[in-house]
Amino acid sequence: MLLSCNNDQKHHFKGEISSKNNSKKQETFGIVIHGGAGTILKQNMNDSLENAYLEKLEEAIKIGHTILRAGGTSLEAVSATINSMEDCSLFNAGKGAVFTHEGTNELDASIMDGATLNAGAVSGVKHIKNPIDLALSIMNDSPHVMLSGEGAEEFAREQGFKMTDPSYFYTEKRMQSLQKIKEIELRKKHKSLSFEDPFIKDSKFGTVGCVALDKNGNLAAGTSTGGMTNKRWNRIGDAPIIGAGTYANNSTCAVSSTGWGEFFIRAMVAHDISAMMEYKGITLQEAAKIVIQQKVPDLGGDGGIVAIDKDGNIAMEFNTAGMYRAHMNAKGELIVKIYKDE
C-alpha cells in the first residue's frame, strides 16, 4: 500500500508583504528543503514510491517559492512549506509520524527568524496536526522559546488550535516498522533499537525541514519530526532544539538538520555551521562539509543538513546513502534529488 499525501495546499501567505527592511528589496531569494536522510537506496525503492517522494518534494518547495516570489517573508515560506510536508504521510512528521515504544505519536518542531534571532519550538505533543504552526505561535505569541507536552497543548488551545484525535496520525507502514523493531529487540534482547527503522527496508530519518532567503535579505529555518521509531521515555531529538536541529542568522545562514538526533545535539550542528562561517570566515559549503563529513561522524552519528546563506548560496550536505532534498532559486530553477550519487 502506497503512503499517500494530502494535496490540499494551505498557503499561509495572504498576499501582503510583511518582511522587515522593505526598502531594501533585492532580487536574490531561494529555498531549500529536506525530507530526511539515511540509508535510502535505489534498489530498495520501487518506482511508484520514488515518484511519490519526488512529486511531493516538488509540490512542497513550490509552495514556499511562490510565497517568496510574491514578496512574502522567509518565515511565511518556511512555515507553509513544512506545513504541507507534515500533511503527507510519506514523511516522518505530522501525518506520517513514527510510533513510540508505547504505540503513540510524539511530535516535535522548531522555527527561527534570522532577522531577530527569535525562535519557537515544541516537543512531545500528541494532538497537534501541524507542529510547525504551534512552534511559530510559541515564537510570536508567548514569552518563551520552547514548550513541551501537555503544557504546549494547553497553550495551543488558548491560541485557538484544534486538538487532533491521535487516530489521525496512524499509518499501517509506521506501525509495521514499530512491530518489526520490537521483534528484533526480542530476538537480540537489546535494550533499545530506536535507531533502527525498517521502513523501506532500511534505517532512515524522515525529519522534514526548510530554509529560505526572502527578497528583503531575511533568513529563516524550520524543522519538524515524529522522532525515532520505538523511542521511549519522552525522548527528544535535535529537531526542536534551537542550534542543533534549526538555526538562522541573517549575518550567516539558515540551517535545518536531519539525522541521528543525539549526535546532532552534542555537535550543535546547525549553530556550529553558522559559527564557523562567522568566526573562521569560511563559506557555507566549507562549514557544512566540515561539520557533516568530519565532526558528526567523529562522534559516531550520521545524517545531513540543508542550508542557505545571506547571499543565496546553498548547501545540501549529508553523510548517508541518501537524503530527500530539493532547491529552488530566484530564477525558478528546480533541483530535486534523493540518492547520494546524483
Please identify what each model-predicted range represents.
Residues Q9-E342:
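Alpha/propeptide regions of enzymes that mature by internal proteolysis
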Residues L2-S4:
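C-terminal motif of bacterial Sec signal peptides marking the signal peptidase cleavage site
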